[in-house]
Amino acid sequence: RLRVEWDTRPSLRQARRVDGTTASAAHDFTARADLSGLPRNQDIFYRVRFEDADSGVLSAPVHGHLRSAPQARGDVRFVWSGDTVGQGFGINPDIGGMRIYSAMRERNPDFFLHSGDTIYADSPIPAALTVEDGKRWRNLTTAAKSKVAETLDEFRGNYRYNLIDEHVRRFNAEVPQIWQWDDHETTNNWSPGKQLDARYHVRDIDVLAKRARQAFLEYAPMRGVRADGNGRIYRKIAYGPLLDVFVLDMRSYRGANSDNLQPQPGPDAAFLGPEQLAWLQRELAGSRAQWKVIAADMPIGLQVPDGEDANGRPRWEAIANGDPGAPRGREQEIATLLRFISRARIRNTVWLTADVHYCAAHYYHPDRAAFQEFEPFWEFVGGPLNAGSFGPNALDATFGPSVMFQKAPPAPNTSPLAGYQFFGEVEIDGRSGVLTVTLRDLDGVAQFRQPILPHAAG
């Protein structure tokens, strides 16, 4: 059984004990404990051990540290990114592993938001790759990462692989985390009815998605199965009076990827789905936090293609459909949401995302848009964390985005050796309420910085 002892002092002399769940093969020996009721705005030091169910013998301890959420106004800093171990780029011992996790840890964040693609279940890790300029990329390898994930244990093995990395383990021990998922937790661009390629012996995407979801929920640092019985991933994280984070699930409720030009809303044009969309509207309207960060696993206005359909029409993976006119397809849900935010006078919303494997800052304005019933807002893109770099993607003008900054590689699928790996940092000043977003590279060097003034009524 998991045993957690925590204290506000590093000595742990007056530690409080919380017993968690039992680690067993049924959940790949993952376990969790609910540390509710922590004192606010405190450094929390903890010790984790496992107690043998029969003998009572305790394992060697593992220590960690976190800062609890604030109760009063105060400075907040967090980091976000996505896309871990993609395109065959795994843990490279020649460069010391996934160093970007140490760069994020050294920013001393209050928490980390993983915007999805926490693993690449469809991306095996070979022993070596030849990359740009003839350079050699070496990987640590495991059996689970030798092929695409199909069995439950192979999906679990993708998460175990990432934990081999010393930078990831130290980061996990020091930084609280919020995870969401995207496509690669299952397979590339998955949606209902997806046709799997020849690497797969399991041909049913629904079977893969069910196994992938179980593995994600076992390894994600979040509370267990919720009232819906299916481990709902979308949720709100309240972080003091200055910040609410609205974590979306843009994967579980979508219709099949298509030309995305449906003239009316419906199951085929769903992206968030009606229940999640209603939840988001309700939670945004009820939020009293100054800043409302919408954590999306995909960008709004970037065109993300997914090949062609049976009729040779472009098929789309994200929200945008390449048509700069009025909202159609999945864009209709976003139009409904943006209209609601405007009419309800909900201020100070900022969108954070990843997915496209380069960093960018986008500013959406109705004066440039085909759909104009919304207030201007910012969207920031981070990633990748340890994967091939791509981009930049073309914009879709429906919601009037403009590129204020972007940094992408000179060629697609550039390796991490080239340096095009990015994370974002958000800082909220406790006195002024100003929110500042900084995009940083794998060494933590700032590439772009944007302060945003709060709206007084927000």
Label each PLM-derived region with a short phrase.
Residues 1-458:
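Metal-dependent phosphoester/phosphodiester hydrolase catalytic core
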